[in-house]
Amino acid sequence: LRVVVAESRIKGMDYMIKTSDTESIYLLDDAFQHRSIFTGLSILLTTYRNPFFKDFILPYGNLRENKKGYKRANIIIVTKCPINMSLDQKSYFINKIKPKIDQKIFFSSIKYSDFIINKNETLPIKELEKEEFLLVSGIADSYHLRNHLKYLKFDYFDFSDHHNYSKNDLNKILDKSNGKLILTTEKDYVKLSVLIKSKSLFYIPIDFIFEKKE
């Protein structure tokens, strides 16, 4: 697996094509509006809590284009769904989206691990029942994670998606944790573990469960 970061998608793709095998598959992240590159397969993600058909165009909402743009997608994935969704719940989304004949709809859920991990050790999540901890996340919507941990006692810091942690952020995190265990997402752990040299920093792994509904 090769990862290429480029401000210009065209230059990035040109580099990949010139330096890869002809049989390679190229996966572009966050590229639904990049019309300058023709894709063979377009996948649209929309969350269970905030589906695109209930949203509005920026700045009033979060959409970057008209809702009708979903018709360009080959596959639509409703993410962060409840595990074991009912047929009624699935039917609601299908009726709202009204997929074209050639579009496929999938439903995915997040399954959280029963363990928390860092570079030194793995602990059962039940260890978190013993004392309060600090939850730190820099993801688009931390509701799902906070809801999963709601039976535990914790304080939390919510940062924006793809947040680059500053020295000021780190000082706030360390001050608020006050020596307590710090729990974060696997994505944020990659950034924070470089900046916070503490054995008390852990992340909770996740798995994705897909259930197809066409």
Q: What label would you give each PLM region?
A:
Residues 43-46, 70-81, 96-112, 130, ...:
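Conserved beta-strand/loop subsegment of P-loop NTPase cores
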Residues 29, 73, 108, 138, ...:
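Residue-level signal for inorganic ion chemistry
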Residues 1-99:
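Phosphate/Mg2+-binding loops and adjacent switch elements
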Residues 18-24, 128-129, 175-180:
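Glycine-rich phosphate-binding loop signature in dinucleotide/nucleotide-binding domains
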Residues 37-38, 67-72, 98-101, 127-129, ...:
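Short, conserved loop/helix-junction motifs that constitute active-site signature segments
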Residues 142-177, 181-192:
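A C-terminal functional module that forms or caps the active site or interfaces directly
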Residues 111-115, 160-163, 199-214:
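Short, flexible loop segments at boundaries between secondary-structure elements
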Residues 113-123:
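Acidic anion/phosphate-binding donor-loop and adjacent secondary structure
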